[in-house]
Amino acid sequence: MFNIPPVVIATVAVLVLVHALRMLVLSDAEDLRFLLTFAFIPARYDTDLVLGGSFPGGLGADLWTFFTYAFLHADLLHIGLNLAWLLPFGTALARRFGAWRYVAFMLVVAAAGAFAHLVSHPGAMVPMIGASAAISGAMAAALRFVFQRGGPLGFWRLDSPGDSYRVPAAPLLATLRDPRFLIFLGVWMGLNALFGLGSTSMVGDGQEIAWQAHIGGFVAGLLLFTAFDPVVPRRELDTRPNG
């Protein structure tokens, strides 16, 4: 049975409630102010722009929008696609990390996605929203262990579902050389390029996909996985004395 951890259910609930608030409760003017307060807007950080100081939220928003943009979505399709990616990869990560590490990790990779967008779109006025930079980070982290022997997608999966999510992870270089990782990455990138699945949107005409944020979240997930992972790496297990 596909048992979703409570922290992932809570994540889904928060995303849905925020979207419902914007769509059903706030007026158009209120929603615009809400968007300008909590979406990620690179122009906030451009001191050469006259409008840079006119965004609502002030200095606080300069910090919190690195995280809060991930809770906003453009429409039902946008949030639905992101939830479809979040459920499997968020579940894998939460089962391995536990609730608090999962939350901290998701916030960090969301911020990494925002930073990548800031670097690639300096001074841009178009707000960026969507959870997929964080989900990209969760996907990258999950790919460090799901294909390992005894893991949920590996050979000889362990009988206990909980244990299968806590097998020792592959080293980073081994992950990057794993054909299964490369195939999965290629399919995911292709789907995003063709259909914008799980996209982080730059709000505006056409809702351009902020693919740099996806890459930022993904790379951060790969690199920071070890810092959050509570499972002892295999190489450390192999060097421990017996008895």
What are these regions (language model features)?
Residues 1-243:
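A detector for small-residue-rich transmembrane helices and their helix-helix packing motifs
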